[in-house]
Design a protein with these regions (language model features):
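S-adenosyl-L-methionine
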Residues: 114-130
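Core catalytic lobe of class I
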Residues: 1-112, 128
Length: 130
């Protein structure tokens, strides 16, 4: 029997206390156009294409994680991902100068996440030219 496949997902945001984020203005790295676009429209983001590369069946696209982190966190904030999988959230946290804690039940996924994070660190430290 034919069926329609969902082509969208919800992102839900929960908070305790006030939704206003308190922090240093210098640690805000979202620009005005990003904020305006991301808060007034549906997002159209291509599915993750590296699931086979990282041997994980359900990865979020890096662009989705980056948008969420830039919207709801500042630089140096701590982000906890209790189902870290192949480490997409932690990798993007490293890229955006957020502190992070990632856990997963799979030892293999944890190893993959560590490799991705280490690679991201190398990219940040490598000079573009000498």
């Amino acid at each position: 029997m034919p069926y329609l496949k969902y082509t969208w997902e919800f992102v839900e945001y929960f908070y305790k206390g006030s939704p206003k984020h308190i922090g240093n203005k210098e640690d805000i790295d979202i620009v005005g156009d990003e904020f305006k676009t991301w808060t007034t429209a549906k997002w159209s983001i291509a599915p993750e294409r590296n699931m086979k590369k990282y041997d994980h069946p359900a990865m979020f696209p890096e662009e989705l994680v980056e948008r969420i982190l830039k919207l709801f966190t500042y630089k140096n904030d701590i982000v906890y991902d209790p189902f870290s999988g192949a480490g997409t959230t932690c990798t993007i946290c490293e890229r955006l100068d957020r502190r992070y804690i990632g856990t997963d039940i799979s030892e293999q996924y944890c190893k993959t996440a560590i490799e991705r994070i280490e690679y991201e660190k190398c990219l940040k430290e490598a000079p573009l030219w000498e």
